[in-house]
Amino acid sequence: MAKETYVRTKPHVNIGTIGHVDHGKTTLTAAISKVLAEKQGITATDFAEIDNAPEEKERGITINTSHIEYETETRHYAHIDAPGHADYVKNMITGAAQMDGAILVVAATDGPMPQTREHILLARQVGVEYLVVFLNKTDLVDDEELVELVEMEVRELLSEYDFPGDDIPVIKGSALKALEGDPEQVKVIEELMDTVDSYIPEPKRETDKPFLMPVEDVFTITGRGTVASGRVDRGVLTTGTEIEIVGLKDEIKKTTVTGIEMFRKTLDEAQAGDNIGALLRGVDRNEIERGQVLAKPGSIKTHKKFKAEVYVLSKEEGGRHTPFFTNYRPQFYFHTTDVTGVVELPAGVEMVMPGDQVTFEIELISPVAIEQGLKFTVREGGHTVGAGTVTEIED
């Protein structure tokens, strides 16, 4: 049978399930897949397949995650589910799973638990702005008032982390019953997905964002000038556009792109995802280097000091064997290069153990083009020992 071609007729949205262990994230994922598949008369992804998540490597870190896809009437979704708590943390911090929104699963039998809180905080830190709540296992709670109490608790918890707790949609039901085909619960899953369709907005396309390209390599073409090559991170670049070279130096240099090449062919326009070479007017070979970025003028600045949410690899994952303290000086790998920085731990945190997730302050020795939400890795002698997301720019 010929392989199906992916026809892009509906807008694409990335979502995931988050919440405490055993509250039913994977069961809900399987139920959504089944209910939507049956509506369209196609085969669903079953529970065992989702639960047996394959290992992936992202930025040198091994993560177990399942990706499944499904469609509603108006959208195409890629849905991410991770089996273990550590997998969630790593997923969100490394950006392996970019989520446009998420379904927070809370068991009505338990109410919010420690990881419920952690996942809400993580979503806030890494920029997942839209959450829809699914109160699961409501069939196991006899007292309707208890379910309402749990809902209130969840709403308060969301508000505590600056989500609109009073306005976030909360859907109640049983993922397991829906998976078993209970008609009433199938309707609940349909209602949940209608809510996700309407509440989680369509993401802004990468091509609509301001142009940014981390520089991977620089070379000279005799008689033509300096070429910077790399993968366009976002936005669109057209020949003749003025751009800035930002990072590693205090001053920002302006230049004009006089030519764009991809696979040895000349292009008029490059867009997010393209690997290109950009010919830069009036730039000497020594005025630009790997680790800088080409960017739309005024869209990104250099910074040295910021706060970050960081996951520190455990010894088993190939990370450090010993804890680190304030004044730890590893390299921070941003865009395409390592820059040394000094770590300052928050008050009351004496040390950070391998396997910990922590927020701390970093001061780099050279300025780097940084913005909130940027992902980086922490390295020692070329080995990855952690991964982080910039949560707040300080200087």
From Swiss-Prot:
Binding site for Mg(2+): T26
G1, as annotated region: 19-26
Stretches for region G4: 136-139
Catalytic activities: GTP + H2O = GDP + phosphate + H(+)
GO molecular function: GTP binding; GTPase activity; translation elongation factor activity
Region of interest: G2: 60-64
Disulfide bonds listed in the record: none
Binding site for GTP: 19-26, 81-85, 136-139
Main subcellular localisation: cytoplasm
SUPFAM superfamilies: EF-Tu/eEF-1alpha/eIF2-gamma C-terminal domain, P-loop containing nucleoside triphosphate hydrolases, Translation proteins
Enzyme Commission identifier(s): 3.6.5.3
G3: annotated span: 81-84
UniProt xrefs under Pfam families: GTP_EFTU, GTP_EFTU_D2, GTP_EFTU_D3
Subcellular localization: Cytoplasm
Region (G5): 174-176
Protein keywords: Cytoplasm, Elongation factor, GTP-binding, Hydrolase, Magnesium, Metal-binding, Nucleotide-binding, Protein biosynthesis
Domain of life according to the entry: Bacteria
Record domain tr-type G: where: 10-204
InterPro entries: EF-Tu_GTP-bd, EF-Tu_GTPase, EFTu-like_2, EFTU_2, G_TR_CS, P-loop_NTPase, Small_GTP-bd, T_Tr_GTP-bd_dom
Gene Ontology annotations for the cellular component aspect, listed alphabetically: cytosol
Similarity remark: Belongs to the TRAFAC class translation factor GTPase superfamily. Classic translation factor GTPase family. EF-Tu/EF-1A subfamily.
Protein role: GTP hydrolase that promotes the GTP-dependent binding of aminoacyl-tRNA to the A-site of ribosomes during protein biosynthesis.
NCBIfam families cross-referenced by the UniProt entry: EF-Tu, PRK00049.1, PRK12735.1, PRK12736.1, small_GTP
Record's subunit section: Monomer.
Protein name in UniProt: Elongation factor Tu
Gene that produces this protein: tuf
